[in-house]
Amino acid sequence: VAGGLGSHEQVSYWLNHGADAVQVGTAFAVTIEGDAHENFKRVLIDADPGALAEFTSVAGLPARAVRTPWLVRYLRQEKTLQAGACADPRRCSQRMDCLTQCGIRDGISRFGQFCIDLKLAAALRGEVSKGLFFRGASRLPFGKAMRSVRELIDYLLDGTMPAAA
């Protein structure tokens, strides 16, 4: 089961109802041990539901991300960019064919029209104005606090909340 899981009760429900595993993304991305830049973690932690936007990714999949300056500009131009889509392998600025299908390289107009590699790398480096910060819509288990992986696992599996910091 993937998506929308952020509490012990939700994880327990699915595991007790036959799921072999659950996928928890954002809560692990913002742990102390996570190797992303501090700004990356803060953007995800500080985003409230109104700060999120849903759109189609460059791979053609539904996406949800924090409305950063880059994403706001992109969404304003998205229809124009999609209307000008044309298949041209040279449009892949990284020349790495990181996706099987890519809206910008393959000219698929209904897909996103940006380089996902560049945008995710900027986010990982903490470049808030340039990065794409994917985020789940669920409330984070520890609110605005950044906790360890051990504390997160203890909470998700056992319901043990860490002591106040």
Question: Which ranges hold each PLM region?
Answer:
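Conserved active-site-proximal phosphate/metal-binding subdomains
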Residues: 6-165
